[in-house]
Amino acid sequence: MADVKPYQIFPTVIYEFNYTPVDKIMMTSYIDQLKINTPQTPDDLHELSYFAELRDKVKEISKQYLDDLQYEYDKIEITGMWANKLNAGDSHAPHTHSNNFLSGVYYLHTNENSSPIQFFDPRVQAHVLRPRNTPNLLNASMMQYNAIEGRGYIFPSWLSHWVPTTEDKRISVSWNIIVRGEYVEPNTLQNAYI
C-alpha cells in the first residue's frame, strides 16, 4: 500500500457549548410575554439584565474561538442579540449574518420535536458532481445539529444556515459579533481598522 497522507484544508469551525444561565426562567418568561408580530424580538437583549450572564458567556466562548484560531484583535463586540420564537409549522429561511464576524445560537426552550439548525457547505463548486456516497463529514453538502435545550453554537457569520419546519415550539437566542482591531497586514491596500 502506498504511503498516503490526507490533508484537510480550509476548514469551517463551529463551536458547541452547553450552559444553563441562572436567569433561564426569567429569560424565557420575558420572551414569551413580548407582544410582537414577527418570530424575532428586538436585537437589544444583550443590554437587558436577564441576558447579561448569557452575553458574558457568549463573549467568553467567542474569545476562546478567536484565540484558538489565532486571530489578533483588540476587543469583541456584540452588535445584536435577539430571540427567535418558532411555533409548530414555522421555519427560518436560509440566511447569513452580514457585516459581522461570528454569530451564534443558544437554545432556551426546545424538545425532541424541535427542528435542528442546518448549515450548508459554502463551497458550491464542490457539489457540481455528486457520486453516490455514504454521507460523512468529508463529503456532506449540509450538516445539522439538534436544537437541544441548554446548548449553543458559535460559527462564522458568512456560513449559510436555516431551520426547517419545526413540529413544536422552539425558543432560541441568537447574536452577532464584530471583532474590533486591525484587518489584513499593513500596506496591502486592503488593510483597515474596524
How would you name each of these model-derived features?
Residues N176:
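An acidic/histidine-cluster motif and surrounding catalytic segment
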Residues T79, N100-L102, N113, K169, ...:
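Residues that flank catalytic or metal-binding motifs in active/ligand-binding sites
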Residues N84-I154, P164, V179-N191:
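Catalytic core of non-heme Fe(II) oxygenases with the double-stranded beta-helix
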Residues I9, Y73-K75, T96-N100, E167-K169:
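A generic structural micro-feature
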Residues L159-S172:
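Ligand-binding loop in jelly-roll beta-barrel domains
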Residues M1-D74, S91, Q190-I194:
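Non-heme Fe(II)/2-oxoglutarate
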Residues I76-N84:
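A short glycine-rich, His/Asp/Glu-containing loop-to-beta-strand
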